[in-house]
Regions:
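Terminal targeting signals and extreme-terminal segments of soluble enzymes
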Residues: 1-140
Length: 140
């Protein structure tokens, strides 16, 4: 499956990220880039993007990067550092890059920046390769 097809599959079939408003905008082997137009529903009571939303962006970007190798993978572990609050931001950009790609276990580093390029989050995720070729599992 081509990367453009994988991007389209993620943007249409991933109901959680679709509900969030997260869009996959770039993907290649071991890499993914996602964007989120920040809306009121993403905010917490102090006017910052909710930490759970930021975690979901980071995990989703890493998950897309993990699937770039052609099979589905699932999160095993995630560690996140919130470096700066996401106050008064309009857009969030998450980029995930492979640190190590193994036969079953792979590690990805994700960074989230605002529209001005300020680093807000750095995270690391470990994924387990399910060895299920993309297209072989349905969402039914």
């Amino acid at each position: 499956m081509e990367y453009d097809q994988l991007i389209q599959l993620h943007n249409i079939e991933d109901y959680f990220t679709k509900e969030m408003g997260l869009q996959i905008v770039d993907m290649r082997e071991g890499y993914a880039k996602v964007k989120l137009a920040v809306e009121k529903r993403h905010m917490n009571c102090i006017g910052s993007v909710h930490g759970g939303c930021l975690f979901s962006i980071a995990d989703s970007a890493a998950g897309v990067a993990a699937s770039s190798y052609g099979s589905w993978a699932t999160t095993v572990n995630g560690n996140i550092s919130y470096l700066s609050p996401a106050l008064q931001v309009k857009e969030l950009i998450g980029e995930a890059k492979a640190v190590k790609h193994g036969k079953r276990i792979s590690v990805f580093q994700t960074e989230i920046r605002d529209e001005e390029g300020n680093l807000l989050v750095r995270a690391e995720f470990t994924y387990y390769d399910l060895k299920k070729e993309i297209g072989s599992m349905s969402s039914d």
